[in-house]
From Swiss-Prot:
This is Thiosulfate sulfurtransferase GlpE. GO terms for biological process: glycerol metabolic process. Residues 17-101 form the Rhodanese domain. It comes from Shewanella oneidensis (strain ATCC 700550 / JCM 31522 / CIP 106686 / LMG 19005 / NCIMB 14063 / MR-1). The active site is at C65. One of its GO terms (cellular component) is cytoplasm.
Length: 101
């Protein structure tokens, strides 16, 4: 079983420019609707099984939360579900928003 990796905001920018990447945002729906990384999917308990069933397990997957803490647990869980290349965004959406404001 693989383990997730940490990813900085700069690395995420490079990754999105270089290859096809899946981004899941685990923040609550209101926070997601108020702002999120382009192309991100709002992953929650209600749509988790559907997402796992439809997702490309071989594409890089970046997990985003508020500050980069909760995303680590979610990233590890997704590794355990069979995703091969999983990342947790250090600093979360807050860091991404600050870097892109």
């Amino acid at each position: 079983m693989s383990s997730f990796k940490h990813l900085s905001v700069n690395q995420l920018v490079q990754m999105t420019e270089a290859k096809s990447v899946q981004i899941v945002d685990i923040r609550d729906g209101n926070s997601f609707n108020n702002g999120h990384i382009d192309g991100a999917f709002n992953l929650n308990n209600e749509n988790l099984a559907h997402f796992i069933g439809q997702a490309d397990m071989d594409r890089p997957l970046v997990v985003v939360c508020y500050h980069g803490i909760s995303s680590q647990n979610a990233a590890q869980y997704l590794c355990e579900q069979g995703f091969d290349d999983v990342y947790s965004l250090d600093g979360g959406f807050s860091a991404w928003h600050e870097a892109n404001a």
